[in-house]
Amino acid sequence: MPKSVIITCAPTGGIHTPSMSPHLPITPAEIATASIEAAQAGASIIHLHARHPETGKPDPRPELFQQFLPVIKQSTDVVMNVSTGGGLGMSMDERLLAATSTSPEMASLNMGSMNFGIFPMLQKYTEFQHDWEQPFLEMTEDFIFPNTFKTIRYAIEKLGGDHGTKFEFECYDLGHLYNVKWFVDQGLIKPPFFIQMVFGILGGVGADSDHLTHMHNTADKLFGAENYEWSVLAAGRHQMPFATQSALRGGNLRVGLEDSLFIGKGELAQSNAEQVTRIRSIVENLGLTVATPAEARMRLALKGGDQVGF
């Protein structure tokens, strides 16, 4: 019998800017509402960033996370996954601050340094509400997103060791899987672990179904299919097709306005819940079931919602 599909929703992220969609959650209240609605629609994990409530700029301050994490916890049983990616240009200490302050069940962790180019968005968006938006996009033409072996080890030991937090290991290219393997071999990553395969970011692996097949096959060879859970996210218009392919292949998936602002060609998603509802319908029409938060916790061996710091 096929495993149920774990749906992660990433409601705001740190890539899109407020001028790109009026539906992008910005304030703590908006992020809380978007997360609760996504959980009610079928997401079992919520991947969370924070933003400055007035400007919408990615903001790592723990006090912002503390304004929405408890609200989400009070309203749902969803697993909360705090980003350590933060916003482009943040130091590793800044990126870890929210997670080390809140001790979540899960945190994301990028598994390799890379070019992270979102500057092509400037070809589409030319008018901005806030002064920071255009320079933020422009700087990524000459920017390397740093995730060294030393900083990855630090994050694993700090969050995993000190807090019992487990990771969503974000792999933007084939080599990132081998980086995960190195840490597995060192005994720093233990099964069951969670691999998020990311497609369609300029600087990472392209959104081609052949690459999805190769990434999945390589992960099986490196880790053994019984030792890990895998999930797929794809940027922009590739979001739903790649999520569907992952479900068909026995994997899990991620949607949300962090990864795509749209629900269809040229049509902005009105909410994160709209995307979750769409992919849940697809999954169920394929004869598959959607995982509950309890099922996600069991399969990922999480510490439980009663062990967090919020």
Language-model segments: residues:
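N-terminal small/glycine-rich loop or linker at the start of catalytic domains
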Residues: 1-23, 124-132, 138
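Glycine-rich, proline-tolerant flexible connector loops at the mouths of alpha/beta enzymes
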Residues: 19, 44-66, 198-203, 261-265
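Active-site mouth loops of central-metabolism enzymes
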Residues: 11-32, 84-91, 141-146, 168, ...
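Conserved, mostly hydrophobic/aromatic
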Residues: 31, 38, 49, 107, ...
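Structured C-terminal cap/extension of enzyme domains
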Residues: 178, 217-221, 241-310
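Histidine-centered catalytic micro-motifs
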Residues: 9, 33, 43-55, 79-81
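Alpha-helix-loop-beta-strand connector modules within alpha/beta enzyme cores
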Residues: 9, 57-82, 155-159, 215-225, ...
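Catalytic alpha/beta core domains of metabolic enzymes, predominantly
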Residues: 106-258
